[in-house]
Amino acid sequence: TLNNAASSLDVLLTNMILEEEDKVIFPEGEYTLPMTLPLDKSITLQGAGQSQTIVNGHISVNSPSGGSVALTVSDMTLKGTDNSSAHGLIGMIGTGKDIVKLTNCKLDGGAVTAQTAAVGVRMESVGAELSLTNTDIDVNYYGIGLRNKEQVLDITGGTFTAWGAIMTSAGSMSPSDGTLANTNTRITAKDATFISRTLLNGKSNSYGAVILQEKYNGVTADFTNCELRAVDGLDPLINATQA
């Protein structure tokens, strides 16, 4: 494994080939990805703490057909920078098995507000698995978007603040009208807080803390010791210029 500090992300991404199961350690500090980090191999990213290591940028997990890619991240903040990103801060977009595990992390949307960019994690691939432990998400659109069938979302602890903290959508499915009788998707959350952020022009554009859309059927959701909270009125982050 690498097991060394990623002192220059430009060097890391342009001159070094990441191998399967490599581990990249980020010491305390702030770093900026020069482009969206594309992953077709399983790697681990380790920081020095949620508030100590800040990585600006976006990551896409893109497993090959018949294969799997696991992204394991701990002890850092990933902050959005690209308003044109099509897959959120972390996109799970492969044709194989995409797995993401976040521990003691934060996904911070920052100033990113575009609909596809200002999402914590977009789960777009069939069978995607996302696990979050003591991880916070604070973004301007969807915290976590489940967008395909046979997906698994497991949450333990953390605070999730977004226009929709958890949102299911048929957007990535193959039926032309987006309808699927049974997605066989499972959502499990315990000891977590989900907060709905008002978007655009005040109360009329509030959405919800957890949204299970009507065309995305057959979801099993189990919430234990969780708080779902709606925020009434204008959101100061998004609506400062419109208020």
What are these regions (language model features)?
Residues 1-9:
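Short, polar loop/linker segments at the starts of domains and inter-domain junctions
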Residues 10, 20-44, 49-58, 78, ...:
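N-terminal extracellular ligand-recognition/capping segment immediately after the signal peptide
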Residues 30, 49, 77, 106, ...:
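A structural signal for beta-strand register positions
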Residues 43-93, 106-119, 190, 196-198:
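Right-handed parallel beta-helix/beta-spiral solenoid domain characteristic of secreted/periplasmic
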Residues 44-47, 71-75, 99-104, 129-134, ...:
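All-beta strand scaffolds that present successive hydrophobic residues in beta-strands
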Residues 52, 80, 109, 114, ...:
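Residues in short coils/turns that link rungs of repeat/solenoid architectures in beta-rich domains
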Residues 58-60, 70, 85-91, 117-122, ...:
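Structural detector of coil-to-beta-strand junctions
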Residues 196-197, 202-243:
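Predominantly polar beta-repeat domains that present long G/T/S/D/N-rich surfaces used to bind, process
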